[in-house]
Amino acid sequence: MTGNPSRCPAGSAGRLGIMRSMPIKLENVGIAVRDIEATIAFFTDLGLEVIGRDTISGDWADTAVGLDGNHAKIAVLKTPDGHGQIELFEYLHPDAIETEPTLPNEIGMHRIAFSVDNIETALELAAKHGCYTLRGVATYQDVYKLTYLRGPSGILVMLAQDLTKG
């Protein structure tokens, strides 16, 4: 099935009865980055584990991604609990397009969020990569400590510490 890649009416799949009962799980979140090695170092320092690396190209990659001449380095990382994965892409061809980092209130991909045992420790690790909070750490109803920071390539990352645990 193909169509206009820039348009998918919100809710149209549900209104048409498509995929209502199909089992689904989140596979990963894909993020295009400027420097895959620096980004891997950032996320592994936060506790994620690299579970695969490859360089992709060829007709299958062009078709799947929708870019002619697609050639990229990729890495898949998983969270320690095994429930979350991110896939990082560093494009070799076509050239990566630099954009301004997104703001929290912009429509589209917003952020990637991680639960951490100790937010201060996580922020110390992030600082080693030159990544700092946008405004500081907030406490939400004595339940969570939360913060947003800019990761490598301007990725908006949320860290959350559950204050109700131990």
Named regions from a protein language model:
Residues L92-P94:
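Short, solvent-exposed aromatic-acidic interface loops
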Residues P23-E27:
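Extreme N-terminal starter segment of soluble prokaryotic enzymes
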Residues R7-P9, I18-M22, R53-T55, V76, ...:
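Vicinal oxygen chelate
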Residues T99-E106:
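Non-DNA-binding regulatory cores of transcription-related proteins
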Residues A32-H83, K128, T147-R150:
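Core segments of cupin and vicinal oxygen chelate
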Residues G58-D62, A96-T99, Y140:
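A cross-kingdom feature marking solvent-exposed beta-strand/loop segments within repeated
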Residues V29, I112:
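Hydrophobic adenine-recognition pocket in adenosine-nucleotide-binding enzymes
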